[in-house]
Amino acid sequence: MGVYTFVCRSSGDEWTAKQLKGELEASAATPYELQRRLVAAASAADSAAGVQSSFSMVSPSSAVFQVIIGAVGGGAAIGGGAAAGAASGGAAAEAPKAEEKKEEEKEESEDDLGFSLFD
C-alpha cells in the first residue's frame, strides 16, 4: 500500500502539485484535472489495486491531495480510527445510543419547568 501526499497551489490560471516526500509532480488548468493527473502518476508508481483519494482546500489558492494505492474497503481513509471503527461496525453500535439520548430529551416538557411558554 502506498500513500502519496501532494501540496497543491494555484498561481493564476494553473494548478501545480508537488509530492510532499518524493519526486512526483503535475500541473493542470483545474483542480479536478490536477487530481486526475496525480492519481494517474501515483498509480503508475505503485501497481497495487484499489485507489482512494482525498482533496482538501486549505485556502482559495492551496490544497492538500492524498492518494492511497492498494487500500482495502470503501470510505475515507483519512480520519484514522474513525474509518476503522465504521468498517468494523463501531458506528452501528453508537447509533442506538444517540437515539436513546434523543428520547430522553423528548421526555422533558414545559411542566418540568414550572411554567408554560404559551400562557
Swiss-Prot record:
<keyword id="KW-0687">Ribonucleoprotein</keyword>
<feature type="compositionally biased region" description="Low complexity">
    <location>
        <begin position="84"/>
        <end position="95"/>
    </location>
</feature>
<keyword id="KW-0689">Ribosomal protein</keyword>
<protein>
    <recommendedName>
        <fullName>Large ribosomal subunit protein P3</fullName>
    </recommendedName>
</protein>
<dbReference type="GO" id="GO:0005840">
    <property type="term" value="C:ribosome"/>
</dbReference>
<dbReference type="GO" id="GO:0006414">
    <property type="term" value="P:translational elongation"/>
</dbReference>
<comment type="similarity">
    <text>Belongs to the eukaryotic ribosomal protein P1/P2 family.</text>
</comment>
<comment type="function">
    <text>Plays an important role in the elongation step of protein synthesis.</text>
</comment>
<keyword id="KW-0597">Phosphoprotein</keyword>
<dbReference type="InterPro" id="IPR027534">
    <property type="entry name" value="Ribosomal_P1/P2"/>
</dbReference>
<feature type="region of interest" description="Disordered">
    <location>
        <begin position="81"/>
        <end position="119"/>
    </location>
</feature>
<dbReference type="GO" id="GO:0003735">
    <property type="term" value="F:structural constituent of ribosome"/>
</dbReference>
<dbReference type="InterPro" id="IPR044252">
    <property type="entry name" value="RPP3"/>
</dbReference>
<dbReference type="Pfam" id="PF00428">
    <property type="entry name" value="Ribosomal_60s"/>
</dbReference>
<dbReference type="GO" id="GO:1990904">
    <property type="term" value="C:ribonucleoprotein complex"/>
</dbReference>
